[in-house]
A protein has these predicted regions:
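Sec-dependent N-terminal signal peptides
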Residues: 5-17
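C-terminal transmembrane beta-barrel domains of outer membrane proteins
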Residues: 210, 282-291, 303-308, 312-313, ...
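Gram-negative/organellar outer-membrane beta-barrel architecture
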Residues: 117, 219-415, 483, 498-502, ...
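Short acidic/His/Gly/Ser-rich catalytic and metal-binding motifs that mark active-site loops
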Residues: 36-38, 117-119, 201-205, 374-376, ...
């Protein structure tokens, strides 16, 4: 009885120990042509891998597959074996093999089902005399397909009819003859454009943005660019790549499907601030934005902005856009702007510009504007705001290759402008002295660059750099550039700093939640310089600041709402600022 129990226990222990698989402790690889890293990657084995029945056969099959794809069709894998160790839990794996002689491409025969002027030989001739490599052949076929698709043949087919393998009877070398069958398909032109889904926008507004002439030859690269052109209109949800088909009349039809979004928006808030002391009147404060970006579906746009900051400061702005003047690629823009700044001055501007749409990515504009600065009767000698009139002329260059205006995954936005303002001071008389220069020329230089790059899926790096400089013999406060806030240096108040020279940079890491909504972390830097003005008791001010934080940009019916929490240099968490902004481009 005791012997039977002992025997049963030994049997159980043996079964229990054998249930644990052995693991690979060391892998020895021998190779002449390929690296050890390549062999291990193709064999899909690593140290600590558990040994299973058929492991060596799996390694042989995987290596044979990868070797043959790279032209080594005569390999021998008899040297793959598993060696047990004294420690029964581990084994060593030895991978020895013979690659054999490579197989070389001898001939490439191309058969055509129809005739065309496209010469495909140049895409395959260079393969002759090379090692027969599956991936090189596929790459050549893809290049030939791409070339044909961009040259009027979207329905081309290239088929590998066969590969004939043989050995040279004299030298014993291995060769392969490749037989290809090419069917060009119908040569295609874009004869019609069919737009679907546009309930408000006119067809001609969409087709003119495409810049496709009737009968233009088909190009796949151009077709893939069309969504970017339509997205810039900001009338639609992200547009998909158009489809191309041949109708019963053998005409090429480009089918574009769009989904319209809200383009006419109103948002605002109105409040009333009661009097804080006897004898004082209350006042209305608030913000109103009206944006009509596609009037009657014609692409015309108008906007109205009103904001009452406090009792004495107010902004009013009216804009209008007339696109594609008389059917030509020229846009006319007009702006009427008025700002009341505290109790110091009233600024009024009337500007107009003519923009030439040179290509779908590049535009240039000339602008002219008039401006007047009217000092308030309450202004004192310390502020010394002059009554002046300004005539401004300028030029602007814009390059925009972004794939989407709201949440781009790639592309750049570059804007460079120059303007010359002729300023004439006409009062108040008590401030005008004999040595005061009353005719002043002011030059403004502006540079802005944004670059976007998708590092990983739905993760985008955005980098922006902006610089502005004002040159002239004499500056007033209304002439200076403003820095700080949601659109420049976050972590600081809106327009907190003034300077004749300002610059800032923005670095954002964005994670896309939807196509046009994303969360982001940011790091901003900003610099400003305002030179001293001894006559007005203004000291020189110059500083470099940083801001950083996190934010969220969400697409809404009113536009894209950007909300961020930012900290300035030296701020504690409780000192952080929350910035709100609606990106609703005019």
């Amino acid at each position: 009885m005791l012997h039977r129990i002992t025997y049963s226990l030994l049997l159980i222990l043996f079964s229990f120990s054998s249930s644990f698989p052995q693991s690979i402790k060391k892998i020895v690889v021998g190779s002449n042509t390929f690296t050890e890293t390549q062999i291990l990657q193709w064999a899909q084995v690593t140290p600590s891998l558990s040994v299973y029945p058929g492991l060596t056969d799996s390694i042989k099959n995987r290596l044979a597959f990868n070797f043959s794809n790279r032209g080594y069709l005569n390999s021998n894998f008899d040297g793959i074996q598993i060696e047990p160790l004294s420690d029964s839990a581990f084994v060593n794996l030895t991978i020895n093999f013979t690659e054999g002689e490579a197989t070389y491409v001898k001939n490439i025969f191309i058969e055509r089902e129809d005739s065309s002027l496209i010469d495909f030989n140049s895409y395959f001739d260079f393969l002759k005399g090379q090692i027969f490599n599956k991936y090189s052949l596929e790459e050549s076929i893809n290049e030939a397909l791409t070339f044909a698709e961009n040259n009027s043949y979207p329905f081309i087919k290239i088929k590998i009819e066969g590969i004939f393998l043989y050995d040279d009877s004299a030298s014993g070398d291995h060769f392969a003859d490749v037989h290809l069958l090419i069917d060009n398909g119908q040569k295609s032109t874009i004869d019609k454009i069919d737009v679907k889904g546009n309930t408000s926008t006119k067809d001609y507004v969409i087709t003119r943005e495409l810049r496709i002439e009737q009968g233009e030859e088909y190009s796949q690269t151009m077709i893939e660019e069309l969504p970017k052109r339509l997205n810039r209109l900001r009338y639609f949800e992200p547009v998909a790549t158009p489809q191309f088909l041949i109708n019963t009349e053998k005409e090429g039809v480009l089918l574009i499907e769009v989904k319209e979004k809200q383009t006419n928006n109103f948002d605002g808030i109105i409040g009333y601030i009661p009097a804080s002391k006897e004898g004082e009147k209350g006042y209305v404060t608030g913000l109103v934005n009206v944006s009509l970006r596609n009037l009657f579906g014609t692409g015309r746009a108008a906007a109205f902005h009103w904001q009452q900051f406090n009792r004495f400061s107010q902004d009013v702005e009216i804009k209008y856009l007339e696109p594609w003047l008389l059917g030509y690629p020229f846009n006319i823009n007009g702006t009427l702007y008025q700002r009341k700044q505290d109790t110091t001055y009233v600024q009024r501007k009337l500007e107009g510009s003519l923009e030439y749409l040179a290509t779908e990515d590049i535009s240039a504009a000339v602008l002219v504007g008039t401006e007047s600065i009217i000092p308030s009767q309450n202004a004192n000698s310390y502020t010394r705001i002059f009554n002046s009139s300004i005539l401004t002329t300028g030029v602007n260059l814009k390059i925009d290759t972004r794939d989407d205006p709201y949440a781009p995954k790639g592309g750049v936005l570059f804007i460079n402008s120059y303007s010359l303002s002729r300023k004439k001071i006409i009062g108040p008389q008590e401030f005008i002295t004999p040595d005061l220069e009353t005719n002043i020329n002011l030059q403004r230089f502006t540079f802005s660059f944004w670059g976007f790059y998708e590092l990983f899926t739905n993760q985008v790096i955005a980098v922006g750099v902006t610089g502005k400089e004002l040159r002239g013999s004499f500056f007033e406060e209304s002439d200076l550039f403003k820095l700080g806030g949601n659109n420049s240096l976050r972590g600081y108040r809106e327009e907190q700093f003034l300077g004749s020279r300002v610059a800032w940079s923005n670095l954002e890491y964005r994670f896309l939640l939807t196509r046009r909504s994303y969360a982001f972390a940011f790091f901003d830097t900003g610099y400003y310089l305002r030179n001293a003005d001894e006559e007005r008791n203004i000291l020189k001010s110059e500083d470099f600041n940083i801001g950083y934080g996190i934010g969220l940009s969400i697409e809404t019916g009113l536009g894209v709402l950007a909300v961020s929490f930012a900290l300035a240099k030296g701020d504690s968490f409780s000192d952080g600022k929350i910035h709100f902004g609606i990106i609703n481009e005019f």
